[in-house]
Amino acid sequence: LFAACQKAPSVRRVILKSTSEVYGSHPHDPVVCTEDSSSRRPLAEGFPRDSLDIEGYVRGLGRRRPDIAVTILRLANMIGPAMDTALSRYLAGPLVPTVLGHDARLQLLHEQDALGALERATMAGKPGTFNIGADGIIMMSQAIRRSGRIALPVPSLGVGILDSLRKATRNSELNRDALQWLSYGRVMDTTRMRTELGFAPKWTTMEAFDDYVRGRGLTPIIDPEWVRSVERRAVAVAQRWGS
């Protein structure tokens, strides 16, 4: 495809939908990934590795045809009522295995904002690489509670084993990259998105996740409002004892 673009004089703009997965997920990753960050562990194979290779190909096109504006959008993990994603599959069952001692920070992107970012990039013709993600984060523990699921903390090896068992009961198995993201999370800096590309998502991470829960009609195992009420009472008791 890029070879055909290179030979076509009429091509003036190429937009590549890439992914935040090129940064990987690792416990020693930076708190926030910028466009200049790289994975702490080499990406050996799979979708993240393929995405990074494709980014290299399109940059090569830009070097050979400097008259073409090449824009790379690294989208945060998307979510929404119509999306089948690692997170939606992870929350499919009533019990959600989590890595003992870890609470991943998740930055999401609503499916409608993903389309909005692609539209903005197409109209703006701004070359460069841009992180595309919503404001704010949601902790994995929050996501489990807000979807009415029950967390099942297990050692890291146990998550993969339990997920394989879930596959046998018709829930999709998660690959290694997805399990690492669900264990450690990933957050991107989106300054360039706002200041250079001129795009601002309409949905925050929390709003995007709540829209997914509403749209999927998830039946809570435990009423999320009851859990939040218990948390508020526990905080109030702790504050009284501490005063």
Cite the ranges covered by each PLM segment.
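Glycine/proline-rich active-site loop of Rossmann-fold NAD(P)-dependent oxidoreductases
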Residues: 52, 65-68, 79-89, 120-131, ...
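Conserved Rossmann-fold NAD(P)-dependent oxidoreductase catalytic core, especially the SDR/UDP-sugar
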Residues: 1-46
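Conserved loop-to-helix N-cap of the C-terminal "lid" that shapes the substrate pocket in Rossmann-like
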Residues: 72, 102-115, 129, 140, ...
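Active-site beta-alpha turn of Rossmann-fold NAD(P)-dependent dehydrogenases/reductases
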Residues: 15-19, 74-76, 133
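Mid/C-terminal beta-alpha module of Rossmann-like enzyme folds, strongest
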Residues: 115-177, 190, 209-210, 219-233, ...
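Conserved sequence/active-site signature of Rossmann-fold short-chain dehydrogenase/reductase
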Residues: 22, 78-80, 114
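A conserved pocket-lining segment of Rossmann-fold NAD(P)-dependent short-chain dehydrogenase/reductase
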Residues: 38-44, 88-113
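Catalytic helix-loop patch of NAD(P)-dependent Rossmann-fold dehydrogenases
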Residues: 27-72, 77, 98
